[in-house]
Amino acid sequence: MKLSVLSVLLVSVAQAAAAPWRPREPRAAGSKRLTFNETVISAALSPSSISVQWIATENDGDYVYQEEDGSIKIESIVTNRSQTIVPAEKIPADAYSYWISPDLSAVLWATNYTKQYRHSFFADYYIQDVETLETVPLVEDMVGDIQYAEWSPSGDSIAFVRGNNLWTWSDGTVTAITKDGGPDMFHGVPDWIYEEEILGDRFALWFSPDSELLAFLTFNETGVPTFTVQYFMDNQEIAPPYPRELDIRYPKVSETNPTVKLNILQLSDNTVSTIPIDVFDPSELIVGEVAWVTDTHTELAVKAFNRVQDESKVVIVETASGETKIAHERDGTDGWLDNLLSISYVGPLALGSGDASSAYYVDLSDHSGWTHLYLFSTSGGDPIPLTEGEWEVTSIVSIDQERELVYYLSTQHHSTERHLYSVSYRTFEITPLVDDTVEAYWSVSFSAKAGYYILTYAGPSVPYQELYSVNQTAPLRTLTSNAALIEKLEEYALPNISYFELEIPSGEKLNVMQRLPVGFSPDKKYPVLFTPYGGPGAQEVSKRWQSLDFNAYIASDPELEYVTWTVDNRGTGYRGREFRSLVAKQLGKLEAEDQVYAAKQAAKLDWVDSEHIAIWGWSYGGYLTGKVLETDSGAFSLGLLTAPVSDWRLYDSMYTERYMKTLSTNAEGYNTTAIRHTDGFKNVEGGFLIQHGTGDDNVHFQNAAALGDTLIGNGVTPEKMQVQWFTDSDHSIRYNGGNVFLYRQLAQRLYKEKNRAKKEQHQWSKRSQDWVV
């Protein structure tokens, strides 16, 4: 493609975004530049926001919140009146989190917190009476070993998990529901892979709306291979003689997965029934979602997937009889099926040919080619579309049964944006709740009865929050204005952000976000850093407020002044099923091609220093960086790989097989997607850096170790290769100051790359105060 054609293309920018070769002036008029401390270490220049725990009371709009002094209050967001229910001096010591009972009579406190995996943690739990303020332990002999606890909707009982067994508490009486829980058997909480890849949370139990029944999953890890993570320091100042070893049942590609069973507990007599979900072979079954589709306890929906997640079946359980039926099926063998966790009950309806007594729920599906809202009957039959078009619904945010409305967020204006709408499941009328002709990224939180909502403008400008009633269009009041931040930012000269679409040779258009350095001049030459994530269904290019983070820092530091390009390659999200599914069975191939193509187009711009174009990614982005270097394209001069996957055989089965299928059916695909060709690593002018935490339970350090061995064994020289491990750090790399060190190292490598062949050193001493932690 000729530069003139590229220029014409880049004019087709998302609305109000400036063309990249004619950048807007910085939004702030000051002269200060962002520093390392302000962007990486401190959050002083971050927008503030409020989030509330809505509660169902006689008056819709009540919520619970915690004051800065620690006291717990109930406040009406409508009247602004508040009531203290637990004063600060009565808060339990070492409190981590709290949940008020639905009847407002007690508070459940989690204390003595210990992190486990991404979502899960261990804690002690206490119940505090709101009237007397007396606090009693949930279990007398607890030692920071309770995994999860949850109030019933009626507020008179608690289900909790300890030692991988399910227990109940009711009026001070604790009852063991299961007794065979242990290292290989999980009741009511997910094992590692279900927490990380399927449920995305730390619980696997669900009370019925009337508190009569409790559905819960049981995971059996017998036969699942074990991966051992070593902790060399184990939070001690001096290393113990032997590392602590954590054995995790971690199924990798084509290895044995945990089996899963659905159980229903009758809370009145503590009897448990196991409900067979036999729509797939037990060794192949994945339970992706469990949701009550009733106002009482009559029906339960279970979304089941096959092992490689390209077939799904929604099973309806009739709880009185224990009978099951398949209500809906989906074939996604043209790619994969995402587990969107979006089943939402709406109630009994008489629509079309549906049974008048049938219950309905809404769910998201992309069977039309785009993810949209559909109305499903629990009796089966064809779903009824509520939305349609070449755009996608991204989330269901509330169901208003009284007004018969579904509230949702979608990309109707542009895939990088989110706007709020309602649709009637009676008349099918769609109503925007925001001006959907203006570029914006909105999020929302509805009250318990959906009569009020907090609307958050999340970008592209400085965020703010307003309170609305569904009965009027004007806001009731502003909750968060971030006026102080706006005033503070006027002291700064900020990097300039714009958005545009880049057409690739195959005809698809890629979303690109560009950040130009402070004081940008088209008469100068600037180094460029590409910052992809690029994973299936992911999105990095959005019109959210872009945090003043490391990328903003390297665009502000006068000794760095990097342009950054973030390119959402083929396979990323919110562009339709066809765009997503292009990468099926061949991860890393098209994604790398797209990043290379974008870099070559950037290199043609007059103000780009084409000899210094770097790429940096974390996790999937680190893997993609490796695949880009492997192409040996010459488009990039430096590669920075943080916590990368290097071979999909080394990653977990449920994520990898969703996109790559099994080894037996796609052996060649696994061979080509692994990072094994080393010429590109030998030839990249500025070399490359690999960073990884040794305590990473997600993307194991094994990936970096194996990649390093491949590179060394194939003759990559020390001048090209730098490797940095972070002792005991997990995937976020934060242990013992690791995060700050990581970003310092990245900044130094970028400085070295910018000045490659100049043999200069970054003069950190000029701004020594900038490195104070």
From Swiss-Prot:
UniProt xrefs under SUPFAM superfamilies: alpha/beta-Hydrolases, DPP6 N-terminal domain-like
Residues carrying covalently attached carbohydrate according to the record: 37, 80, 112, 220, 471, 496, 671
InterPro entries referenced in this protein's UniProt entry, alphabetically: AB_hydrolase_fold (IPR029058), Peptidase_S9_cat (IPR001375), Peptidase_S9B_N (IPR002469), Serine_Prot_S9B/DPPIV (IPR050278)
Primary residence: secreted
MF-aspect GO terms: aminopeptidase activity; dipeptidyl-peptidase activity; serine-type peptidase activity
Enzymatic class: hydrolase
Keywords noted in UniProt: Aminopeptidase, Glycoprotein, Hydrolase, Protease, Secreted, Serine protease, Signal
The EC number(s) this enzyme carries: 3.4.14.5
Pfam families: DPPIV_N, Peptidase_S9
Residues annotated as the enzyme's active site: 619 (charge relay system), 696 (charge relay system), 731 (charge relay system)
GO (cellular component) term, any one: plasma membrane
Similarity remark: Belongs to the peptidase S9B family.
Protein name per Swiss-Prot or TrEMBL: Probable dipeptidyl peptidase 4
Gene: dpp4
